[in-house]
Amino acid sequence: MVRKTTEVKKVLTQSEVDTVNHFFKKAFNFGKEKKYAEAVACYDKVIKLTPNHYIAWYNKATDLARLNKYEEAIACYNVAIKLHPTDSSYWTNKGLVLLLQREYAEAVACFDVSLRLDPLNKTAKKYRTSAKEKQGEIFCLT
């Protein structure tokens, strides 16, 4: 017997929607005030109720990077990218964090994807060049 499976999506109540909106706005404002740890805590509440909220994942990643929590930031960027792979800024920011970690080849790969999605992305172009130069320095030293 073959069963047909369907994905069950949680339907939020109006109260939960209000809670998500409240914590998202609160997180965004904390970020503007440079209270990144508080922002991350609020994004966690948003994500708990709406795990596919790719903007919350992206913003959380950005605030984690600002706290120098690079591994956690990359993990969050990966989720955001999985949920919304066509946003060039997601790839660019992940590349920037990888660049900070001296993961030059991985950074270049992210910038390449970003530039395929948005060939005019000046930030991706600039930092791709920087990552390639740093990558070249490593090869010259060995």
What is the meaning of each model-derived region?
Residues I47-K48, V79-K82, L115-R116:
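Conserved structural position within tetratricopeptide repeats
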Residues V20, Y54-I55, S88-S89, K122-T123:
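Helix-start (N-cap) detector for alpha-helical repeat units in TPR-like alpha-solenoids
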Residues K4-H22:
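TPR-adjacent "capping" and linker segments in tetratricopeptide-repeat scaffold/adaptor proteins
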